[in-house]
């Protein structure tokens, strides 16, 4: 995380987790982030949801500035060398993607890019998972 703490997904078992892969230079990510803030993070953060933006391969100061510029309140984490990103996509693939993980730690939904219908489907899946 930006404050230097480390988070393991195993520590988040029992919560619905959304990993949002992002970068300050990714225009699609920047377009999606306000929607994640308003439509996912703010309504569900107190209902068992953890949303973590994972910034791909950028230095800490760049990511801090990026967080401030976007105005998001959900936590951002660093991904040096795109180590975590490469578990879900080829390192040279486009950045924008969300990985929704259920309370048991299983991947329940994946998105690519920012497309309205897919985003709505992701929100509905999150709502269902939170009720389980």
Report residues per predicted region:
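A short beta-strand-turn-helix
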Residues: 1-17, 88
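Thiol/disulfide oxidoreductase modules built on the thioredoxin-like
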Residues: 68-73, 79-127
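Structural microenvironment flanking redox-active thiols in thiol-disulfide oxidoreductases
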Residues: 30-70, 81-87
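Hydrophobic beta-strand anchors of alpha/beta hydrolase catalytic cores
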Residues: 18-19, 51
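Active-site acidic short loop of glycosyltransferases
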Residues: 12-15, 46, 73
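Conserved redox-active cysteine motifs that mediate thiol-disulfide chemistry
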Residues: 13, 21-38
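Active-site-proximal beta-strand/loop segments in catalytic clefts of secreted hydrolases
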Residues: 21-23, 54-57, 79-80, 111-112
């Amino acid at each position: 995380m930006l404050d230097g703490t480390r988070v393991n997904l195993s520590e988040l078992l029992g919560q619905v987790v959304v990993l949002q892969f992002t970068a300050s230079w990714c225009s699609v990510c920047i377009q999606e982030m306000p929607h994640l803030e308003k439509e996912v993070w703010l309504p569900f953060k107190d209902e068992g949801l953890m949303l973590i933006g994972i910034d791909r391969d950028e230095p800490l100061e760049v990511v801090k500035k990026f967080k401030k510029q976007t105005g998001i309140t959900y936590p951002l984490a660093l991904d040096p060398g795109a180590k975590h990103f490469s578990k879900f996509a080829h390192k040279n693939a486009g950045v924008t993607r969300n990985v929704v993980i259920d309370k048991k730690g299983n991947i329940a939904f994946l998105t690519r890019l920012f497309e309205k219908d897919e985003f709505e489907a992701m929100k509905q899946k999150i709502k269902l998972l939170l009720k389980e």
